[in-house]
Amino acid sequence: MRALITGASSGLGRDLAIKLSKKGYDLVLISRDKKALEKVKKDCKTEAILYEADVSSTEACIKIHEKFKDIDLLINNAGFGLFGETCNTSLDKELNMIDVNVKAVHILTKLYLKDMIEKDSGRILNVASIAAFPPGPLMNTYYSTKSYVFKFTTAIYEELRRRGSSVKISVLCPGPFNTNFNNVAGVKFSLKGKSCDYVSSYAIKGLFKNKLVIIPGFITKVGYFLTKIAPLKLLLKIDYNMQRKKDK
């Protein structure tokens, strides 16, 4: 068995790699940071192939698929956020975020999905966020990208179900947890986040139970439920105030 993980050099990607290695998966670890991948490899008990790539590039994503064909589990984990009013945030950073958070997920999912359907076997885990559900003033582009990942993944689930395929797909929607995401996005969370170890363990359990939507933590589940019943304008006010507290 072999798993391919993007954004594998730190945080959730790193923890997922180590845990899957303990379950017997050989690994293909993708990141822009080869040195950090080397450190992850030392903690893995199975074969780990390291591949330096920037998944914001369409060509890089296609090359990954061409180079690593025999994949049983794809985890699209690479992603980042950006804090600020839409009128003030960097357009270049936002476009890069869309490339990483959306385009790369779309390309790699689509390419590997075709392979998995052909052999009627395989799993895909796309990492979204609880941010997929509420509106996201002050982190607008990030929330929008995660909403795309959620809808994209759940739609594929139904397509697979209708065709009677054995291929499984899941979407992980964690709340705040402790990774380098905060530093990159330029935020600090007002609520104490879950540990990365907890989120990765919960993700793997949900993945192998064939859960479609994986939401770690009771508080995060409550938050998800509230987004389904609260009026939109109330959600906008609540979310804006929560986002403002994140400002470093």
Which functions belong to the PLM regions below?
Residues T109, T145:
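Active-site helix of classical SDR
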Residues E85-T86, K93-I98:
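Substrate-binding pocket helix/loop in short-chain dehydrogenase/reductase
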Residues N77-L82:
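Conserved NAD(P)H cofactor-binding loop of Rossmann-fold oxidoreductase domains
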